[in-house]
Amino acid sequence: MEQLSTANTHFAVDLFRALNESDPTGNIFISPLSISSALAMIFLGTRGNTAAQVSKALYFDTVEDIHSRFQSLNADINKPGAPYILKLANRLYGEKTYNFLADFLASTQKMYGAELASVDFQQAPEDARKEINEWVKGQTEGKIPELLVKGMVDNMTKLVLVNAIYFKGNWQEKFMKEATRDAPFRLNKKDTKTVKMMYQKKKFPYNYIEDLKCRVLELPYQGKELSMIILLPDDIEDESTGLEKIEKQLTLEKLREWTKPENLYLAEVNVHLPRFKLEESYDLTSHLARLGVQDLFNRGKADLSGMSGARDLFVSKIIHKSFVDLNEEGTEAAAATAGTIMLAMLMPEENFNADHPFIFFIRHNPSANILFLGRFSSP
């Protein structure tokens, strides 16, 4: 599983950087795992140069048996009886008059649990769009009601590939509602907005990175299989959000180094964290093209002959919508280690006051996969 988590994290960091280049100060929220899974399903049907580009950009070329590894990861993540709700769901919607290869359909079903729903894009594209949106709405508990806006599919559409991820988890240590106060959140050196600032003082895995002047805090969810990890600069020192230094240094190796469990220690932390909701929508086509996935979106060059045997398919858009709601109880998100016990008197007390922009991610600890990744820079 380690190869896959390394590949997925590598891609997550690259995509975050690409989104940051397009919008250096706004909020970001994505599910890298959801996007990787969707592209892995497409990868099953790509051939030639198209396959090579997808494989390189998503680091699939570093993973043996990529599809069976995704299959195990999906099983691991969607496992019943967990103290949180986490669902990763895949589906294909194909034009009913179009012939998809039986091999391709069998593989997507086996590896990704994605069945093919036949729809009438040709005669009734609007009905097909509504059907797809209804399915996504159901998979995300109503949090993503309209993945595809009007006009996004038409009578030329042959295939829509949908991946939805939904997460709802309660904190291992909840914030007391009565401790939440209105407080200023600094967007940059001069502007502030008011937020509902939550507070608690408990023992959490924590670290301070000297050369970055940055605090790292891990907030585990019930059961401790999932955690939210937050990177918070000491202060806003640049002319932007205060995150420039971290974002410039953000690589797979650095992110792992900063946040791996063995580099954190248990501390008594005064945590101030804003309550927030983010809903983001992306057409990832241009961002993926920047990472080297180009032929896939080009009508003349795309080779998806592993899906149909013909060369007439291409991907017109990759749409990603995500939702996160973080509050005192825990986190609701859609996009669809044993601590050492120390004597209380030896425990350092730390302050973690997230009253200015920070980067956060939700990690599946057993597999070290990043389920969600974001930047909170403005309420």
Swiss-Prot record:
GO terms for cellular component: cytolytic granule; early endosome; extracellular space. The modification N6-acetyllysine is found at K137, K177. GO terms for molecular function: serine-type endopeptidase inhibitor activity. It holds the Pfam family Serpin. It is found in: Secreted; Cytoplasm; Cytolytic granule; Early endosome. The record marks A344, M345 as: Reactive bond. The modification N-acetylmethionine is found at M1. GO terms for biological process: negative regulation of interleukin-1 beta production. The N-terminus is blocked. It comes from the Eukaryota. Keywords: Acetylation, Cytoplasm, Endosome, Lysosome, Protease inhibitor, Secreted, Serine protease inhibitor. Its main location: secreted. Residues 351-379 are annotated as: CARD-binding motif (CBM). SMART domains: SERPIN. Monomer. Interacts (via C-terminus) with CASP1; CASP4 (via CARD domain) and CASP5; these interactions regulate the activity of inflammatory caspases. Interacts with PRTN3. Interacts with GZMH. Interacts with TMSB4. Neutrophil serine protease inhibitor that plays an essential role in the regulation of the innate immune response, inflammation and cellular homeostasis. Acts primarily to protect the cell from proteases released in the cytoplasm during stress or infection. These proteases are important in killing microbes but when released from granules, these potent enzymes also destroy host proteins and contribute to mortality. Regulates the activity of the neutrophil proteases elastase, cathepsin G, proteinase-3, chymase, chymotrypsin, and kallikrein-3. This is Leukocyte elastase inhibitor. It comes from Equus caballus (Horse).
